[in-house]
Amino acid sequence: MKKNIFITSLLILLLLLSSCTGDTCIDPDDFGFITFNVSSRYNPGEITSRHEGDQVTPWRDSAYKVNGYPLTIMVRPWNYILGDKNTSGQLSAWCPWYGQKNNTTTLAPFCVKLQPCTFWDNARFDMCTPNPENRNDAMISNPPCIMTDGVGLYFLIAAKNTDPNISPDSQRRPQGITKHLGELTSSVGYEFYSISSTGQFLKAGGINYQYNGEDKSKYAQSPLYFKIIDKFYDDNSGQYRLVIKSGVSDTRPDPLQFLTDLIKKVLFGKDGMIKKTYQQIIDTPGYKISVSAILTLYIMFTVLSFLIGNINLTHVELIIRIFKISIISILLSTDKAWTFFHDYLFVFFIDGVQQILQIINEAAATGPGSQSLLGLLISTQTLSKLFSLLFVDWLGFIYIILYLIALYFIFFLIFKATIIYLTALITIGMIIIMGPIFICFMLFNITRSLFENWLRQLISYALQPIILFAGIAFISMIIRTEIYSTLGFGVCKHDFPNLGPINEIFGSFLEDIDPSLGNSIFYWWFPVPMKGGINNFHKAKILVPNDHIVVDASCKNDHDKCKHCAAYECIDERYIELPFLDLVKDSTRINNFINGKFVQLDGILLIFVSIYLLSKFNDTAVSTAQFIAGTSGNLTDIQKVNQQSYESLSQQINRPLNYVAQAVSAPVTSRISAGTEQASMFFAEKFENMMMERLEKQALSSSANKAVQNEVKRKYGIDSKDVKMNAIKDYEDGISGLLKNLPKRNELKVKELSQMKFIQLRDKISANKYDVQDYAALSKEQKTELDKLLKDANLRALASEANFTKDYQEAYKQAHQEMSGRGIGLFGKNIGVLRSWQEMEHRVNVKRKLKEEKRIGIGEKIYAGYTGIKRAALTKILGKDLRDAYEGNLTSAEWHDFEYNDPRLRTYSEKLKDDEKAREYEELRMHINKETIAVQADILSPEYLVKLEKAGRQSDVEYYQGLAQKQLIHDVHSRLFEEGEPVMMGDRFMREKATDSQMRDMIDNAHKKYAELIDVDRYTRRQEYYDIIHEKAKENLEQTYKELKDHFKSDNISIEEMPSLIAQKVKDTNTGSEIDKKITEEINNFNTDVKNYEYSTAVLNKIEDRKQAIMNEVNAQIDKINKYRASAKMEQYVKPILNEGRKLRTLEDHLKNMT
């Protein structure tokens, strides 16, 4: 019984709230607009005049202040012919003739049926502006008439600290910004639309004023005034009804803001408890004596310590001590103590927090309606639109129930956040009260920790509401967007039920009570249009009513450059019935509305996901603030305080709602989970990108993690000592210098060019400088010229070093992620013993998992073999066709049917075999990792294999090459069979289903994958790096060989002879005391070149072997496809990959070849 009473009371309360609006219809973008009426009549005492026909009246204060955002004001349309009434609740027009004293909010009877005024040449701009020099009458072409659409109405943004009504002159010429609301909006590319009382969309008057330059900050928080300007007011009648859509600070009371303001006033007001208590402590005689004694002792200890040489008073130390003495001295002054500490310290923790929260709330208000999320959700306009869904769709009732449940949870989450905020506020007050005691503790080292803890607590409790409401603001932006998208349509009141003649009896009586009631006390809200159909929806250029980002051609590739538009700032073509929905992005929802489906359940699902995230954030905000301020070990947990404050109330109200929640939540639980996962993935992706950027910077900084660097060296063969940390910048600078010599340098971007390989860069520069397709299209002379240009800029070497540095960054990121994936956290990455333990624990877990998977795989493999025998026997007995027809009943067909969720369309049996291969590779990978850890080097890298060969360890080389070959086969297969465009499908599909064109595409795709493999392989990518080393060493040795040959006139010089010949040549060509030093330098250079040549030659040959192995494996797959083609009697499509590799000669062979 109590449950029913509660639910009934809640629904009645919300229904009453939805009926509180005085409008007959609500616009699509109206979620609680500020409304203001401006009458064309004034009391006689308010009117002043210099002479007859030159009256001036005061400006009407709207009681609102502008906030710097686009000021959007709409004038309600009014048309008597279309059914609008001459009542204060509907009239939005005025007449300059025939008015009487009682026509403040209504038209004179004679004016009601007059036509709207028209003007010669549409010259609305030449009205009676607030300029005393303008004495011209409006150029009306059809007097007498009525003024509509804001004609004659002006707004004034008064300059700060000015009063436009202080004198008649200030009323005529006020200081500030004055604009006419009656201008034709079509001239600026957009229109205002509003629903009339009869339910029709009509064009309306208004203005969208956007500030220029410094005016935004100059006029922020300036008061807003309105006035209908005329030269003679005594015969005016009527009014304008205004809707302020954006641009003012909403001062309407918030459900919970009143409570916080009340407590703030009691605690921190002019005569608040905190100030009184603080002053009482300072006024206590005992306190003053104690502070004086402490200050005297501090000065004495300072002087004594300085005299005996116990402290060294530097300038900085002296200033600090004088500052401390000055601060404590202020505590002795009763009159100045509170003023000083409040204005220079405490204000940051009280008013500063409040200002930050206000900025956060304004940023979260991404559209019309209350800045408070709760205020938006329970506004009469929102609830009216919500309840309009009840009779237009059978899902409307479910949506309303879900909305109310969501509203319930949001209320308690925000209530919980408010309790945390108020508790923090009270705690800040208590900490401030103790300030006079703890501030004295900063004098001595033994008590300084008490002062620091006091200050740290003050910071912690100030941060808690900031972090908390920042999270709430972020989540509320998501909820707001969904509310605007799902309820962003117009609604109108309709008599419901229609009582016929009875309505007419009560009509006039009801209109006196509330003009919006119409003819019946029984009514309901219905959407406009009430039915779907494309003819009921109309496109137009309008002001977009919510914050959004404009993505156009100029920023399509870089969204950071896209323009961010505030609500009502930018113009776009949209349906006037659905102004929040973008024609492209929201096409699905628009189609639902056009088809008559007004209920959008996916929106309510996202709201529930946001509520879940908000609840999680509420639980972590306090601990986050404590962690930042270093007070996470506090004995006081503010969350427990707030939990106890509303726990009993929550339990009581939850009881009747639990049944409703369980009844309606079951069908949507799975979709909520999916939405939660999607939202979590979004945040995870953003966080991951941020972390990857941080790791890229960390890899090249002095703070790079040594354990990760060792992991990179061990697993990827890249030593951080070999990496030039500024290589990327040097490469960009080199490109920038080169571009200065190009004719069309403005067409090229340094950042884009720096991402290219050297060959691609050369092609790009060739096209820019010579207007050709690429480098190959150049003539011999042009190639020589360009090669010299590139060589002078040293771009090839710079590109190689930059690519090597990027590879190191990528390896650093991967190593960091791999270590984290193995359970090595922040401490493990810095503590060797802990890291070794975590590595061992990870290996044990992987082995246990592999063992379990292998055990399951063996059982499945046995059963798959058994079903395969049954299937083969069935094929022999019945034949293939009958087997396929009856297979599902006679054998376990699921083992041999296609897995349609598998990109390669393998059978389950084939998939088992591939899983077994994957387990074998995992064991191989663990074995390679074990070997790598043992030698602390990348055992598969060409560099390490060359070092082993030079050390004479040929057996180890062969063993490691065998491991490298196995891993390479797996890497090639992984690339060839990856999702998207696999080169090879399942065996059964290839035998029975694959077509000629599919197999040709597979072979063509294999060629593309081969190029990708060569490009991304971390070993083959180093070829350019060693090519440059090889070429430099080769060039130096050839030059040395040529000089020796010319000097000694001999063509038969061996490598072994060259050092002694170099020494002899230096003696023959040089004299002086530095000759020995010169000989040593020349021989060292020669030995370095020999070493670089031989080492780079060996590494490059190993890289070439790896490329050949990749090619062989890809060709093996191509051959396999061709065999399937031959079995299917298809024409041959043999297209093997050819490797245009090279084998480099030894140094001795190369020098012999020179002779």
From Swiss-Prot:
Residue ranges of the TM segments: 289-309, 395-415, 424-444, 459-479
Q: Which Gene Ontology biological process is one annotated for this entry?
A: protein secretion by the type IV secretion system
> Which chain positions have N-palmitoyl cysteine-type lipid attachment?
C20
Lipid-carrying residues in chain (S-diacylglycerol cysteine):
C20
Please, which domain of life does this record's source organism belong to?
Answer: Bacteria
Sorted UniProt keywords: Cell membrane, Lipoprotein, Membrane, Palmitate, Signal, Transmembrane, Transmembrane helix
> Which named protein is this?
Uncharacterized lipoprotein RP108
Tell me the organism.
Rickettsia prowazekii (strain Madrid E)
